[in-house]
Amino acid sequence: MDFLLALVLVSSLYLQAAAEFDGRWPRQIVSSIGLCRYGGRIDCCWGWARQSWGQCQPVCQPRCKHGECIGPNKCKCHPGYAGKTCNQDLNECGLKPRPCKHRCMNTYGSYKCYCLNGYMLMPDGSCSSALTCSMANCQYGCDVVKGQIRCQCPSPGLQLAPDGRTCVDVDECATGRASCPRFRQCVNTFGSYICKCHKGFDLMYIGGKYQCHDIDECSLGQYQCSSFARCYNIRGSYKCKCKEGYQGDGLTCVYIPKVMIEPSGPIHVPKGNGTILKGDTGNNNWIPDVGSTWWPPKTPYIPPIITNRPTSKPTTRPTPKPTPIPTPPPPPPLPTELRTPLPPTTPERPTTGLTTIAPAASTPPGGITVDNRVQTDPQKPRGDVFIPRQPSNDLFEIFEIERGVSADDEAKDDPGVLVHSCNFDHGLCGWIREKDNDLHWEPIRDPAGGQYLTVSAAKAPGGKAARLVLPLGRLMHSGDLCLSFRHKVTGLHSGTLQVFVRKHGAHGAALWGRNGGHGWRQTQITLRGADIKSVVFKGEKRRGHTGEIGLDDVSLKKGHCSEER
């Protein structure tokens, strides 16, 4: 009876405990499959990711190169490798106890054992005494093949020397046996080789693999530009460019002094063809257009001829001969005295002086002494002034004079020189933005200093384009031209940048184009043909494209480009 009562009591307590259990999971699940409870749901723990079949797998960033991921950012390396991401070779020969009995040579991901002279390597890796190998005296041991002794080398990068006993290195880089990825150079080592990034590049883990990435020396401060220059990063290196108002190679920049030449006063031009030169003393020199004026072939000095009347009167000088060809600017004048000519006479060629013909009404009787001697050594000051076109020992050859020749105009006469250059810091330099396009080229401040052009963002759906045109004008018949420019087409869906040339009112297919990249790049293109009317840069963007198209440092030179890139 007592036993039955005890059994009933135990049964009631069990049923009460079972009724209180609601079947819910605990707050945290300690499991080897990476499951955790987050409030009322169960999901993969932090550092784990759910696979397509529903199981949670650990995630390692970066990935394990020679191993497997066993936990969040935790790699288990394969034999022969070490490191956090299993990307380093394990030197088994340095382990204790040593894996080899005699000689050990480490290889990438493994190792090899070799026996001393007089021993042979057995199949189990041990070394056994061999009188035959001892007699051969091999550097790295020997092997018996069909009863013959043959010395062996431990690596494919080693080969037997002519003596048949020692091993010499094989230069895989020179023989072409090496195979290095792009942008890496081969460096030979004893028994092997390594692939190393070129100068200006650094090995980085990008996109799930190791790549040679360009080093931005400008942003890192690893450049040697002048303090008056800007640093521009290019692929594998950098370049220095002097700032506005300075000149030089970028490593050394020298200030360019500003020179301004202003006229001393207003110049009155009388009726008729001719030119008036006004000096500092206020005396006007009227130079008529007379085709019969001659200048002696070699007259180093013109002797002064002074009239009896000292009052100020205009004097005449030879007729200028205009020419469209630009020349260097004028030299500082030396004292020269000319005399007011007599009424018109028949022109003759004197031996020691100058004879001119001018209208009688322009010069009254009498004359004055005017210091108009010209220095024979030509100089080249800048500015829009009257300058000699052909400087020589003959002073001015028949007074061939033109106005408005600058250093830029003079450079256009010489082949292979710069004929146009623009960095857009102070405007478009002759480039024209076509207004009928959907988009426009706009100047934007460069963080490194100055400005560059960029294509505005598209605001309507469909294809959009912005065109920048440079009319060549007189350069249209200059032959081949070298177009050089810096550009960048960066970002997600950045668009397209293209180069065209227009001939006979229309342009053909694009000569060059780019729709992606990283950072600024330098490009040179040879524009072939003598009938090019204009050069066109076309930038295309669509709505929603977040990338940037940039253009800067555009220049044109005569002739072919030294390097197409």
UniProtKB/Swiss-Prot annotation:
Organism: Homo sapiens (Human)
Signal peptide positions on this chain: 1-19
Upper taxonomic lineage: Eukaryota, Metazoa, Chordata, Craniata, Vertebrata
Residue stretches of biased makeup (Low complexity): 304-316
Biological role stated in the UniProt entry: Functional ligand of integrin alpha-8/beta-1 in kidney development. Regulates the expression of GDNF with integrin alpha-8/beta-1 which is essential for kidney development. May also play a role in the development and function of various tissues, regulating cell adhesion, spreading and survival through the binding of several integrins.
Localization, UniProt: Secreted, Extracellular space, Extracellular matrix
Disulfide bonds: 56-69, 60-75, 77-86, 93-104, 100-113, 115-127, 173-186, 180-195, 197-212, 218-231, 225-240, 242-253
Gene that specifies this protein: NPNT
Pfam families: EGF_3 (PF12947), EGF_CA (PF07645), MAM (PF00629)
Biased composition regions of type Pro residues, renumbered to the chain: 317-347
Keywords, sorted A to Z: Calcium, Cell adhesion, Developmental protein, Differentiation, Disulfide bond, EGF-like domain, Extracellular matrix, Repeat, Secreted, Signal
GO biological process: branching involved in ureteric bud morphogenesis; cell-cell adhesion mediated by integrin; cell-matrix adhesion; cellular response to tumor necrosis factor; establishment of protein localization; extracellular matrix organization; pilomotor reflex; positive regulation of cell-substrate adhesion
Expression tissues: Expressed in kidney and lung and to a lower extent in brain, pregnant uterus, placenta, thyroid gland and blood vessels.
Positions of region (Disordered): 301-389
Stated name of the protein: Nephronectin
Coarse class of the protein's main subcellular location: secreted
Listed InterPro entries: ConA-like_dom_sf, EGF-like_Ca-bd_dom, EGF-like_dom, EGF-type_Asp/Asn_hydroxyl_site, EGF_Ca-bd_CS, EGF_dom, Growth_fac_rcpt_cys_sf, MAM_dom
